[in-house]
Amino acid sequence: MLRLVTYYTDTHEEMARKYVMSRAWGFDERVCVRVEQSCPTGEFKSDGWNDCMIDKLRTLRNLPADNVPTLYVDADVCLFPTLVEWCRWRVEHMEPEEVAFSDDVLQWCAGIMLFRSSKRVHQFWDTLADLSRAWNLPDQEALHLLRMQTQAQKGTLPIRAQVLPRDVFCNWATIHQQPPAPWTGESFEIPKTCLAWHANWTVGITNKFKMLERVMLGETSNAAACTA
């Protein structure tokens, strides 16, 4: 059993359906949640962005605490055909309370997360939501600050955190030179090992669509041969 979860607002509906749900081959359960547009433009860190990220955490918190292996992806992630097999293999080697985040190069990325939907993990989503409100930060920055504070105090996070491999879960920053900078239309090659491409490090919804279309055109896997 493997569950796929995403959520979207009206500005991201086409993206969620085209790049995530229509390409969710092989997942046993597919959860796609529409939430109200708390961020009017849908643009990164614009007015209402933090509330939109709390909606993400609420979406995850509303899943059943059934310990089912779950892959969460943002609406701006393009899935590749054999992703489900890789995820099934990975969860076999995961600790019960582990959350594996994708790599944003500078910090962990909450745009792709693999975990078992357990009570402990639900409590972690609640903690992140509370910290996001208290610190007035979006979920990923709250996660980063929590991680830094925990390390400084030689403590432990309430979950076992891991990082997903960059060559499987890719984005512009993972394939670009250091230090990472936003994509401005440069050509790029998709690693042959890529199974999910996240259009972060990309400013604006229009540019995200442009990037994801390039990803679909340059995809090395034979998506047309796969069935839902």
Feature-to-residue mapping (PLM):
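GT-A fold catalytic core of metal-dependent nucleotide-sugar glycosyltransferases
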Residues: 52-122
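N-terminal anchoring/stem segment of glycosyltransferases
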Residues: 1-68, 119, 217-228
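Short beta-strand/turn micro-motifs composed of small residues
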Residues: 5-8, 101, 198-199
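A residue-level signal for conserved active-site and pocket-lining positions in enzyme catalytic cores
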Residues: 4, 23, 60, 76, ...
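Short, glycine/charged-enriched secondary-structure capping and boundary segments
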Residues: 19-20, 85-88, 212
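Catalytic core and acceptor-binding pocket of nucleotide-sugar-dependent glycosyltransferases
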Residues: 121-228
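Short, solvent-exposed loop/turn segments at secondary-structure junctions
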Residues: 9-12, 38-40, 77-78, 105-107, ...
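A structural signal for short, well-ordered beta-strand segments and their strand-loop junctions
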Residues: 31-34, 71-74, 100-101, 156, ...
